Amino acid sequence: MSRFMFSIGTVLRETGQALDRIGCSMQGSNAFREAISKHRTIMGIYEKTPALPRAGFIAPSASVIGDVSIGEKSSVWYGAVLRGDVNSIRIGAQTNIQDNTVIHVAKTNVGGVAAPTIIGDRVTVGHNAILHACTVKDDAFIGMGATVMDGAVVESGAMVAAGALVTPGTVVPTGQLWAGAPAKFMREMTAEEKALTVTSAETYAEVGAVHAAENDKSFEELEYDKAARRMARERDPDYDSHLGIERSQVKVQV
């Protein structure tokens, strides 16, 4: 039944698009063609639909597709693509997938082994990273622009440096920093680097909640914010202080 309704919906949407094209052709040079973005932040495929957290942040420009499961307080940032079409993607709690990261899976590869991508809890995946059919365990850190390939395992608390290439089947042990292309052992992680893996996850969980709230605001709430900012610019802070009004408590009727 669901497939039937989906098919009917597709027909109706395509009919509307066809009518719009006919109307534009009749208007000739006076027609205005508005390009509507077909981007879908959440998209099911092969009868698989992403499972999203109740508390977390999925950026509106991200793409979460297919068999993807994301844990509580995790965040997927702007421009990131999680494509669980030919296999599954599993992401734990309080993990952050930063801007423009690509996460994919494998149905087939050189080893002939189908492989999902599994990411644990409190993992940081830096901007522009690529994770393909690999495993990244709890509290690991993947630097910006790094690539982790099929069958590779980044153990708990390990760190992959920015721009590194972790080749297929490689294991990055706990407490080690790997860098280079191909990635190799550089040294043991410092106490500061180990602390960073924890604070990064906590910070992104907090910031993600702020972004989620801002992106969920209604038109009326946005207009209220604009009016409040305008009043704050126009009214002297000393005036408010004499009235005993704190700026954060100023109420503006829109």
Enumerate the language-model features and the residues they cover.
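Glycine-rich hexapeptide-repeat left-handed beta-helix
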Residues: 20, 24-47, 85, 93, ...
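Eukaryotic intrinsically disordered, low-complexity regions enriched in proline/serine/threonine/glycine
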Residues: 146, 253-254
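A positional/architectural concept
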Residues: 53-92, 96-97, 101-107
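Extended, small-residue-rich solenoid/repeat segments and analogous flexible loops
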Residues: 1-73, 245-248, 252
